[in-house]
From Swiss-Prot:
Stated induction or repression of this protein's expression: Expression is sigma F and sigma G-dependent.
Record's function text: Seems to improve the efficiency of sporulation by fine-tuning the expression of genes in the sigma F regulon, particularly the timing of their expression. Negatively regulates spoIIR and its own synthesis.
Name under which the protein is recorded: Prespore-specific transcriptional regulator RsfA
GO molecular function annotation: DNA binding
InterPro entries: DNA_bind_RsfA (IPR014243), SANT/Myb (IPR001005)
Organism listed in the record: Bacillus subtilis (strain 168)
Compartment(s): Forespore
Coiled coil: 177-218
Residues in Myb-like domain copies: 1-57
Claim: Oxidoreductase is one of the keywords in the record: no
Length: 258
């Protein structure tokens, strides 16, 4: 079946692409295999599906993709007893009828030698690729359809809606970054003002404590002076007090003891 280029992607197509990629990643397959399955279902090339995933759909399912990778690692560890397991492809593209290939070859006036699909391994085969970081392996698998010589070169599908969405996201991110920068500057200024006010209040508290100490010392000194004055007054009153006399039976005056 010849796959025709289609510019319009619907929400159902994006949802199918996301669900298929997440399922392949979660069950230990590759994103490239998921692109092939979606391409056959939607009559699109795997290159178009890969470009749509990386350019538009992926950023909407980033958390789900990370969760799927985590579940895949746990599943592989459980099946392989802690050893890294090889990926298995969940989807096998339908075989091409040999008669169609012969008819196509007969119509072409000149046929150049190309590597056989059966005899040549894919550029980034999940089974023969050396063990590297899983996320890096996924990125290589998603780009292998663009680098493989056996895949027909297909122009990336970019619609006007994709361009507008990208520019809107870019402008929104730029405005958000500017707003965050302004908010950061405002918070820094407010923090500096609060620090200055705190230092001012601390200085006032120290001054009040010093004044209170001075007042306390003056009060104690005043109390001491008042006590001394009171004692002095009592002493003078005792000195000036007139003596008391008492007359006995014989008519003599006797000074009373104080």
């Amino acid at each position: 079946m010849t796959k025709q280029r289609q510019d319009a992607w619907s929400e159902e197509n994006d949802l199918l692409l996301a669900e298929t990629v997440l399922r392949h990643v979660r069950e230990g397959s590759t994103q490239l295999n998921a692109f092939e399955e979606v391409g056959d279902k939607l009559n699109r090339t795997s290159a178009a599906c890969g470009f749509r995933w990386n350019a538009v759909v992926r950023h909407q399912y980033e958390k789900a993709l990370q969760l799927a990778k985590k579940q895949r690692k746990q599943r592989m560890r459980a099946l392989g007893n802690g050893q890294p397991a090889k990926k298995r492809l969940l989807y096998q593209p339908p075989a091409v009828d040999p008669e169609i290939i012969q008819e196509t070859a007969a119509e072409e006036p000149v046929k150049t030698e190309t590597p056989s699909v059966e005899n040549e391994q894919p550029l980034m085969s999940g089974e023969h690729m050396p063990f590297v970081d899983e996320s890096f392996k996924e990125e290589l698998a998603s780009l292998s359809h663009l680098l493989s010589p056996q895949t027909p070169a297909a122009a990336p599908e970019m619609t006007m809606n994709d361009v507008i969405r990208f520019l809107q996201n870019y402008e929104g991110n730029h405005e958000q970054s500017s707003a965050l920068k302004m908010e950061n500057e405002r918070l820094k200024k407010e923090n500096q003002e609060l620090q200055n006010k705190t230092e001012q209040l601390e200085a006032e508290v120290q001054k009040l404590e010093k004044d209170q100490k001075t007042i306390q010392e003056d009060y104690e000194t005043l109390v001491k002076i008042m006590n001394r004055a009171r004692k002095l007054v009592l002493f003078e009153e005792d000195e000036h007090a007139s003596p008391s006399f008492k007359m006995d039976r014989n008519g003599n005056l006797e000074k009373l003891a104080e």
